Structures are given as C-alpha cells and as structure tokens.
A protein has these predicted regions:
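Bacterial N-terminal signal peptides that target proteins for export
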Residues: 1-12
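Generic marker of residues within folded, mature protein domains
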Residues: 12, 49, 62-64, 73, ...
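C-terminal motif of bacterial Sec signal peptides marking the signal peptidase cleavage site
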Residues: 18-21
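Mature, soluble, non-transmembrane domains
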Residues: 23-38, 45-46, 58-60, 91, ...
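Post-signal-peptide N-terminal segment of Sec-exported extracytoplasmic proteins
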Residues: 40-78
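Extracytoplasmic beta-rich ectodomain segments of secreted or membrane-anchored proteins
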Residues: 64-99
Length: 198
C-alpha cells in the first residue's frame, strides 16, 4: 500500500505518529513548483478558482509502502489560499499560505521531506481549479491537460505524469470525492471534502 498527500494537495504525506514538538521550519518560495522531474507548474491564484470556499478535508495519502490519514482545513478567497493540515493527534503539522506575491509555509519536523508544500498547493489546484487555470499553470512547458467530466490527466512528452479521477462531474464545483495519482513522484491522494462555506 502507498501513502497520499494534499491538498493541498495537494496533497501528501507520510506522517509519523510521534509529534515531538521540535521547532517548525519557515520558508517562502516562488510561485511555481515541480510536479514531475523537469516539469514546472505555475501556481494559480485564489482568484482563478472563481469563487471563495472553506472546506474540511479527510486526506488519505499513499507513498511507497506507507499510508497516512490526516485532516486538513482549506480556505480560498480571491486574495489568499490557506491550507492547514493536522497530525493524528490534532497538532498542526503543516500550514501553507499563498498570496499573489509568495507562498509561505510552516512545516513541523514530523512531515517528511518528500512532502513539499508547493506540491500540496499544486495538487489542490490540479484537482479543483478550472481547466483554464491548470492549463495556464502548464503554459511554456511541453505538458498538456486532458479534462472531461470525470477525470483529468496531465501528460508530458506523451507520458502520463498526473491523473485525477472524480466521483461525479467536477467543472465549476468543489467535488466531494477525488483521487489524485502522481505517477512521476509515486504517490496517491484520496480526497474527501465537506464544504463548510461557499
């Protein structure tokens, strides 16, 4: 079995059970991340989602031989995207805040290095943002997005690197159930959302 990230996706994640309370690390990053070796994805803004939303997510992450389940809170407004992920004991494991200017992260030591905050944000955008925003994020690369009512696929030079499947139609709505598989980096995310405010 494997482990899945998120959101953000996002994304996401082999978290260890013991939270030792070590100091968190803080970083700011530019507005793009690598979603497959050599493939940059420019982060869409909250504005590009087309609506504001607050949602609680149950994320099951499969990475290599590990499976981890965690809860996340996601808030998207035109000016800011916030993702807060909690460890199994309810402690804050990860916070990602993205504005038009930068991505800021606060990551607890229990979060493995394979879980990069930029990828959590990219996974969230690939799953939930409109196809036009995802295509803009891939502009200038050789990658292509294929999108229909129940799935999305990103290919790069003819090979599939990311695949998303949905329980139902997903365009212009925050779907309740989605599954993201990053073939290039070898992880999968099962995403179950409960929208609290829209």
């Amino acid at each position: 079995m494997g482990l899945s990230v998120v959101t953000l996706r996002l994304f996401l994640i082999a978290m260890t059970i013991a939270f030792v309370g070590c100091a968190a690390r803080y970083a700011a990053s530019p507005g793009s991340t690598t979603i497959a070796p050599g493939l940059q994805f420019a982060m869409p803004t909250g504005r590009e989602l087309g609506y504001s939303i607050e949602t609680a997510q149950l994320i099951t992450a499969h990475v290599r031989d590990q499976v981890q389940v965690f809860q996340a809170y996601v808030s998207v407004t035109p000016d800011k995207i916030t993702i807060i992920a909690l460890d199994p004991f309810g402690g804050r494991a990860l916070t990602v805040t993205a504005t038009d200017d930068a991505i800021h992260t606060d990551v607890a030591p229990i979060v493995p290095a394979v879980l990069r905050p930029g990828n959590i944000l990219a996974d969230l955008a690939i799953v939930y943002w409109p196809a036009s925003a995802v295509r803009r994020g891939l502009a200038g690369t050789s990658a292509r997005l294929y999108d229909d009512k129940r799935e999305r696929t990103i290919t790069d030079n003819g090979r599939e690197v990311v695949h998303v499947s949905y329980q139902g139609p997903h365009e212009n709505t925050w779907t309740n159930v989605a599954h993201l598989r990053n073939i290039a980096y070898g992880y999968e995310l099962d995403l179950r959302s409960t929208v609290t405010t829209k």
